[in-house]
Amino acid sequence: MTRIGILSDTHGHWDDRYLKHFENCDEIWHAGDIGSWEVAERLAAFRPLRAVYGNIDGGDIRRTYPELNRFTIEGTDVLIKH
């Protein structure tokens, strides 16, 4: 079973507690308003990251992550949207 860590609306704020909170997760899913490329990079360096952009996200994040992210994991259809 895949363990998922879910968050959104970080608005460019990094908190080292994310690492502790998500340490037992296999993937992190971010539902938009990441807020800075640094936050996205740090999350992706820690665990595989699936994300979408939100209304505050700039061009760098919008070019990397879609508005909608739909995929199947372990037979379950998932849609992430901000």
Residue positions per predicted region:
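Short beta-strand/loop motif that positions the catalytic acidic residue
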Residues: 52
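N-terminal active-site segment of His-dependent metallophosphoesterases
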Residues: 1-49, 57-70, 75, 80
